[in-house]
Curated annotation (Swiss-Prot):
Membrane topology listed for this record: Multi-pass membrane protein
Keyword Iron found: no
Main localization, broad class: plastid
HAMAP family for this protein: PSI_PsaL
Protein name: Photosystem I reaction center subunit XI
GO biological process: photosynthesis
InterPro entries linked to this entry: PSI_PsaL (IPR003757), PSI_PsaL_sf (IPR036592), PSI_suXI (IPR022980)
The entry's keywords: Chloroplast, Membrane, Photosynthesis, Photosystem I, Plastid, Thylakoid, Transmembrane, Transmembrane helix
Gene name of this polypeptide: psaL
Amino acid sequence: MANFIKPYNDDPFVGHLATPITSSAVTRAILQNLPAYRFGLTPLLRGLEIGLAHGYFLMGPFVKLGPLRDSEIGLLAGFLSTVGLIVILTLGLTIYGVAAFGQEKTQSSNENDLQTKKAWDQFKGGFFVGACGSAGFAFICLSSIPSFITN
C-alpha cells in the first residue's frame, strides 16, 4: 500500500483530484457516454436527451408520494406537478443563460458546445420538449396499468 499512495509527480506540495476511482477507464467511459460530454451531439439533442430522462423519472415521486396519491386524480395531479417542476427547471436554465451569456454576440468555433447564448437556448428548448414529452409518455404508460386507475 505504501507504493500505491505517493505524491503527484513526486512533489508533496502539489495536489490533484485524481483517485483510483475517478481516473479509472471504467469511470471515464461512463462519463464520456453521458449526453453532456458525448462528442458530436448538437445542443438541441443534448437538451432533448437530458430532458427525456428527467421528465420520465420525475413523474414517479409525484404520483406515488404526492398529496393526492390516494385520490382518483392522483395520476393527473402527479403529471401536472411534474410539468410544473419542469417549467420551474426550464426557468432556472433561462435565468442561468441570461446571467452567464447575457447579450454577447461572440461566435464560437465549435457549434456543439454550450458556451454561447444560441447553443444554450437550443439546449433549454430541447430540455423542455424532452422533459414534457417523457412525462406525458410516463402518464400514458401509468394510466394503462389498471392498478393506477382504480385504487
